[in-house]
Amino acid sequence: MRLAEQRPGLIAVMAANNETGVLQPWAEVHDLCLTHKVPFFCDAAQWIGKLPAKGLGECDFVSGCAHKFGGPKGVGFLKCPSQGPVRSQLVGGPQEEGRRAGTENVASVLSMMAALKERETLLAETDTQEKEAWRNAFVMSLVGAKILGQGEGRLWNTVSALLPGDCRARWVVKLDKAGFAVSTGSACASGKESPSHVLTAMGVAADETDRVVRFSSGWETTAEDWQALTKGVHTVGRELAG
């Protein structure tokens, strides 16, 4: 109804949240935008390379990030309509049809394309349900913790949990010493002292956000790695409980 009445200039939706891993209904939103003839932008940085990209190419705008699917850091892409008002943020030169000035990093772009092709092939050959089972076993082991977005569809590699007891900094330090690199949020939010706007929007109280720890894995992560992390979390939990 709001789309029909207000006619926004653009609707933007994340395909998968970078802090919690929760999947967003981008395909359904895209269908609504088609019905009401509203341009649609999908931030697919977290989705591409982890889940099939089918349907993303039909969105008006799609962005992706190379290092999320095995490509080099510092390069990404934006798919946009060949026609239409796309205002450049970097001006000065005619590169990329005048939409982004500056010399292209051709080597990184080609590496990104190769990595994406390889990862999409791997996705077609891999049953990610096994990876989901490893993650689910880890989640089930977190007794006393609250999983953010519990019950919702999520990426197979990301878990954001509200842990009991001490502040997250102590969890992160102790787990790091045990050999596990966990975080207090996404890399995009590192260094910020204010509560995450994502967690706030999900109804997490300000005093609870200081106990949220994010766990994520990669394609090479094994069942044994998840099991070792489970033991590490339990050990640290006992230490913090005194």
Can you name each region flagged by the protein language model?
Residues M1-G242:
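Pyridoxal 5′-phosphate
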